[in-house]
């Protein structure tokens, strides 16, 4: 990648779902060194970022779940022609580091594991948490587990497991792996799984569209795919 005088020192604001943070923490500095562009990241749940964008927050690039991206495209916040699939991730379970890993390979064992847990933390607004709540209703466990559930905000649901506040944590694989003090048990089994797709796109109000497109090209390159895999996500 060639550094140009117009790019050097320019800034791009990237609003990204926390599910992609571990990937962006590596790709971002690589792109900055190669391009001379300064990246400013804002991480939150896709739902929280959607509200911020609808309220007028300025950004150049967005990394969001597909449903949220569709809503923002319809609202003319995201350029429909400048979108690419970034990565996808599976919803998984975590336990405190060193704790016995339960068998969740089948629906039956998954249910038994949930019923045996003292506390289960999950993201109140995140895509993984929303799917988990749907799964509980599907399994008719929402009432049985009501007193065991710890809905959390601020991406603290896996830290709660590390701190001993929860026995199990539910989150995307890519959000479990970077957290110290926890171990990945594995993904939700079979038809209880939901593959969360993230897309990357340019803001309709970006003043640096060309640079934004360059970053998207970098983030969806074959070299980026290696980083995506290493961080527990699935490249397109």
Regions found by a protein language model. Give the residues of each.
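Dinucleotide-binding Rossmann-like beta1-alpha1 core, especially the glycine-rich loop
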Residues: 59
